[in-house]
């Protein structure tokens, strides 16, 4: 489906680890800046991939746009939030390939100016199965609760929206459970960077999911 909107898109699969997967995508790029589209992203019809950063276009009047990281908004299908979570991103190829460690959040911590785009790029359809849904909510709410990206009123409003139960969508209960667990983990480890970085270790998250859902007997609470 992505090829409908971006005929030259290249797929990366079978690479373990978020950083290595992103770097594999960078190596496939034939340009200095390249778009990243998550596998669960459903591109909206009004979005296109025609924005090209240049050395002469200045962001905030001072930074060449080709040196920045861009993030477009996405629609969350569970809580209807619209912001950068799960949105299409545009990275600098050379900078991404030079990174040796994935911090808690790559886009906002890779050493380039982070630019939010208000246009909606996609629906972030992460609620495809229990684990994927729980994992997505857990990771994002850990970031929001810890303040690792931004610690302000908007962040708290988003966290509150994630932590509301919506049983009228597929796997809404798992999103709710992941959000609450992520909030607790983020608050507990607010100043513990090694602990926060574990959210990018999917084997660790899988163990947490199994531990928590078993402990609370989640399956018996879902109709």
How does the language model describe each region?
Residues 1-30:
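N-terminal anchoring/stem segment of glycosyltransferases
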Residues 19-20, 44, 114:
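Short secondary-structure boundary/hinge segments and terminal tails
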Residues 22-23, 31, 45-61:
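Short alpha-helix within the catalytic core of nucleotide-sugar-dependent glycosyltransferases
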Residues 34:
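Short aromatic/hydrophobic "clamp" motif used to bind/position activated sugar donors
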Residues 38-42:
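The conserved acidic donor/metal-binding loop of glycosyltransferases
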Residues 51-223:
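Catalytic-site signature of metal-activated, phosphate-bearing donor transferases
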